[in-house]
Amino acid sequence: TVDNLFDTYLGKLPEKFTYQGKEYTPKTFAASLGLNMDNYIELTSFTHHPYYQKFEVEVPDNWEHAQMYNLPLNEMMEVADYALNNGYTVCWDGDVSEKGFSFKNGVAINPEVKKVEDYSTTDRARFEKMDEKERLEEVYKFEKPFPEVNVTPQVRQEGFEAFVTTDDHLMHLTGIAKDQNGTKYYITKNSWGTERNTFGGYLNMSDSFVRAKTIYIMVHKLSLIHI
C-alpha cells in the first residue's frame, strides 16, 4: 500500500510529537493554534470563468479540486490591501520562476522594457539605444526601481494561459510599503530561511508583480466586509 511505501522510505508516521516541551497529536496541535479555518476564504481572478462565482483553478497542485471565488482583478487586490491595512495578513500563492523574482536581492518586480515612454529623461535616452535584452540586463541588476508593466486582466490572463504564470510557491503577505517613486510593494515573508538574504527572509513584491503572478490569495472573511 501507499502507507507501507511511505513507512519504508520515510519512517512510520508518529501518532504524537513534542513541541516546546508539550506533547501533541496532529489534531491537538492544530486546535492549539486557535485558528478556525472556516473563517478563511480563497480568492482568485481570471477571465475564463464568470466573476463572483466559484471555480476550480486549473493548476496541478489543486489536487483537492478546491473551488475559489473569482473576483475582478482590482477587487482581488483591494481585498488584499484592506486585509493588510486592517490587522490581517494574506496567504499568497503564485509564480516565482521569473527573473524579476530575486529573493537574494529582496525584491520581485515586473519591469516594462518594451516601452520607454515612462522612463526618466536620463534613463529613457540610454534605454532607447538598447535592445530589449540589454534593457533587461540593466533592470535585473536590481540597483534602482524602473517602471513596471501595467497589468490588466487581459495581460494577467495571457500569462496564465501561456503557462508563464504557474503555481510555484506559497508565501505570507504581511504589510505594504512604497519606494522612493511611490510604487507600492507587498512585504512578503518567505519560507526559504532567514540567512539566505540580508532581509531576514523577507522580500518586497511590487504591485505589478503581484497582479501578474498571483494564482490565488487566502484571507480572513472579514477582509471582504467592505465590498
What is each stretch, according to the model?
Residues Y69-D168:
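Long, positively charged binding patches that form subdomain-scale interaction surfaces
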Residues S97-K99, K178, W192-G193, V210:
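Short, glycine-/Ser/Thr-/acidic-enriched flexible segments
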Residues T1-C91, V96, G100-N105:
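Core regions of eukaryotic protease modules
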Residues L203-M205, K213-H220:
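Long, low-charge, small-residue-enriched segments that form tightly packed helices used
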Residues E161, T166-G193:
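Catalytic nucleophile-His microenvironment captured as a short glycine-rich beta-strand/loop
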Residues E195-S206:
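A short macromolecule-binding patch
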